[in-house]
């Protein structure tokens, strides 16, 4: 039975005050940039040489300045995506910017720019890695239901995430993509590692596609946040952050295999929602991708706000390493449209 105390404060790791402070950020920039920008494949096979990555006008400061000027309060950068190429010089692989056509430590530059511009930084790390497989089988090479990671890969991920958490300062959010590949124990280990090193960071285990009405426990738990990817919150009810998870032991330590999900029930865990969607139709920059219309972008922004979720809008830099001027223009028009709407 859900107690009054649970309903008021929740059984989640972070306090309601911390979670509501994150909700108050409301609007952020998602930045997909890396090897996929250069090989043109969002789900890159990880077989391209590091030298293919070579932005010739890289301007990380521009990215964060655009985010601030667009009214965004936080930003999340893809430190490592499916290609496995890292935007920092990791000590655990040679497949990173340090061996590429532009050796800038992008993660470091991004964090520094965020501090200078008053934007809170977050980082993204993908558990689907086609370059560093260590015997794992990713969805690129097998069916989704057969994909898995080995303990050797999970040790590699743990070591890299430790670098990200200890070398660059505090993060507002740590975004783990495709966490289903880690398995129940692997997700718990990953969650505990992040919470142990940066206890104030909110941890996102990507819940994938859906309107936020159901937390995919077998693929996502444990998590502090609910991702609503390429979707919008339920039109009938908006997003309900209270998720009832039933377990006979300590809820905050429960594994997904020990939990049952009770939909549409207020109670145990307060899990804020975050809509994430691109400003165009692709996560990474593509030469033929089109920006969404001004009206569609305003609608997405307003719906996310009215249905009480944060909005993480993906704004991918191009191969030069800058956000294109057309994209910047769309963001500034969106801010002005929102300001007019709020008068």
Name these PLM-found stretches:
Residues 1-343:
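Mature catalytic domains of secreted/periplasmic carbohydrate-active enzymes
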């Amino acid at each position: 039975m859900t107690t009054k105390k649970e309903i008021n404060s929740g059984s989640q790791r972070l306090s309601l005050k911390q979670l509501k402070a994150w909700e108050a950020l409301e609007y952020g920039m998602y930045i997909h940039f890396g090897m996929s920008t250069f090989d043109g494949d969002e789900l890159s096979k990880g077989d391209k040489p590091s030298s293919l990555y070579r932005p010739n006008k890289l301007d990380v400061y521009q990215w964060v300045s655009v985010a601030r000027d667009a009214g965004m309060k936080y930003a999340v950068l893809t430190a490592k995506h499916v290609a496995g190429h890292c935007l920092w010089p990791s000590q655990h692989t040679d497949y990173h910017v340090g061996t590429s056509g532009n050796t800038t430590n992008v993660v470091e530059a991004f964090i520094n720019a965020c501090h200078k511009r008053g934007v809170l930084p977050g980082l993204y790390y993908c558990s689907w890695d086609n370059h560093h497989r260590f015997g794992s089988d990713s969805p690129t090479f097998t069916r989704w239901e057969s994909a898995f990671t080995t303990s050797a890969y999970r040790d590699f991920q743990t070591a890299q995430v430790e670098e990200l958490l200890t070398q660059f300062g505090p993060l507002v959010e740590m975004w783990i993509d495709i966490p289903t590949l880690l398995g129940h124990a692997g997700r718990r280990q990953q969650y505990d590692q992040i919470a142990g090193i940066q206890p104030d960071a909110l941890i996102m285990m990507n819940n994938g596609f859906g309107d936020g009405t159901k937390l995919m426990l077998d693929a996502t738990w444990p998590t502090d946040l609910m991702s609503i990817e390429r979707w919008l919150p339920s039109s009938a009810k908006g997003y309900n952050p209270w998720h009832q998870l039933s377990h006979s032991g300590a809820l905050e330590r429960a594994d997904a295999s020990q939990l049952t999900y009770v939909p549409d029930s207020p109670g145990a865990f307060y899990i804020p929602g975050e809509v994430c969607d691109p400003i165009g139709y692709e996560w990474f920059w593509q030469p033929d991708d089109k920006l969404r219309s001004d009206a569609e972008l305003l609608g997405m922004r307003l719906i996310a706000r009215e249905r009480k979720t944060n909005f993480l809008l993906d704004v991918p830099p191009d191969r030069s390493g800058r956000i294109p001027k057309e994209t910047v223009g769309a963001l500034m028009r969106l801010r002005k449209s929102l300001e007019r709407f709020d008068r």
